[in-house]
Amino acid sequence: MQTQVLFEHPLNEKMRTWLRIEFLIQQLTVNLPIVDHAGALHFFRNVSELLDVFERGEVRTELLKELDRQQRKLQTWIGVPGVDQSRIEALIQQLKAAGSVLISAPRIGQFLREDRLIALVRQRLSIPGGCCSFDLPTLHIWLHLPQAQRDSQVETWIASLNPLTQALTMVLDLIRQSAPFRKQTSLNGFYQDNGGDADLLRLNLLLDSQLYPQISGHKSRFAIRFMPLDTENGQVPERLDFELACC
């Protein structure tokens, strides 16, 4: 079976922000438990970038709007023959619950911003080599605490993001499932189409092609140019089949 590679591209600013947040939250747990300096810096750097993203926009407001929009979309399926009504009703209740938790939660990221260790590390991350033991003795001693103590603190930090994580996961899952993949063909490495008010493009490419897409556009129209990974010797076929979902 041939291996496919999935590419996703946002068609508006809110989706761009959501995908970045999703990526950074996933990165928080990749190297757990934290057992050394490298793992600690990976964790704190992603926390710092998350807080930077939170400060740039109304993440909570946009998510609450999307939770409401998804509920309205699901309500249009109530009573439609052949549709699993219990599943629809369960999803609506889950969206309502996620919205209630999110709206009553403290400011997103505030718990992390107020943590002394996180604040100290954030100040040093932009300095080359700025997290050495003599620059950050606080981090140095933290890394020598019992593993269980560090694990507990990390779990508390990550848990503070749960209201956001749960709402974002639901929203992105529903958006990704909102459109099926369809076979498309590019000509001379180029493809364009109308977005139909989509928020997200999802594209499957065969790994064997060693091509990647450069995508530009917005929700009403987009263009895809396929580029070879090997810029000197790679070739783009005259006709290239791929799978595309406009979600």
UniProtKB/Swiss-Prot annotation:
Q: What is its main location?
A: cytoplasm
Q: Does the keyword Nuclease apply?
A: no
Query: What are the entry keywords?
Result: Cell cycle, Cell division, Cytoplasm, Septation
**A biological process from GO:** FtsZ-dependent cytokinesis
Q: Does the keyword ATP-binding apply?
A: no
User: What Gene3D superfamilies does its record include?
Assistant: YacF-like, YacF-like domains
Paired cysteines (S-S): none
Subcellular location per UniProt equals: Cytoplasm
The protein's matches in Pfam families, at most eight in alphabetical order, are given as: ZapD
CC per GO annotation: cell division site; cytoplasm
Q: Could you describe the subunit structure of this protein?
A: Interacts with FtsZ.
UniProt lists the family membership as follows: Belongs to the ZapD family.
- Briefly state the protein's biological role: Cell division factor that enhances FtsZ-ring assembly. Directly interacts with FtsZ and promotes bundling of FtsZ protofilaments, with a reduction in FtsZ GTPase activity.
> What is the name of the protein in this document?
Cell division protein ZapD
